[in-house]
Amino acid sequence: MLKLEIKKIKFVNILLVSLIIPLLANAFGLINYLGNKGALTNQWQSLWTQVSLFYFSFFYIPLIAIIIASLWATEHKASLKFIRLSPKKNIDFVIAKLGLAFILVSLCQIYFLGLFYLSGKFIAGFASIDFSIYLYYMILSILLSLPIIGIFGALAIRIRSFGIIVLLSTIFTIFGFATAFKSLKIVGLSFLAIEANNLRYIGINDLALLALFGLGEIIISLYLSDKFLKFENK
């Protein structure tokens, strides 16, 4: 299934989004750091607070939403004909899209971290870096992307407009931060964004809650995706 989904991808559209959004976040963060260099004195840590602020606060959830919506756009252009004629179950297509989107998001995160290192090393002129805490945030951000992929995958089955998907992802980002500032773990990525911006490790209890909410959101989104596909295929 995954190989089949890869063949159907419109790589140009996804590649442009995947390259531009992490680049913009790093550029804004770097410019903000250089403009406030006198007050930001901790080099890598200071640059990270600026870069992660822009990326996780404004860009990451919309990026995920655009990627999964792009994957479903291919099916919508064919009026879901391939899914309708396939002997495979609807949920198989949903899981395949989720898996492919997860791989693409993971690659975006590796690219984002690489840009962070290159900008700090060659533009800001920092010395060597201890990657441990940044890798920790990247791994968590990749894992916590799964619920978002599931949620916007379900929405993308019913909503064909990219504009509406981006708008909903922006509203979802605002909602996530509103809950995260109250220490709620409903939107794991928003909670992670606050912790990452403050360079804090997340406690075991909080990680367990994030996993619990995330698993619940994935299960619900898979169920809704299956129902939405059945409705669309009528």
Model-inferred region functions:
Residues 1-21:
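Aromatic- and glycine-rich beta-strand/loop motifs that create alpha-glucan
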Residues 17-23, 159-177:
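Pore- or pathway-lining transmembrane helices of multi-pass membrane proteins that form conduits
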Residues 23-64, 68-70, 95-162, 199-205, ...:
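Secretory targeting signals
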Residues 28-48, 166-234:
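Terminal transmembrane helical anchor/hairpin motif
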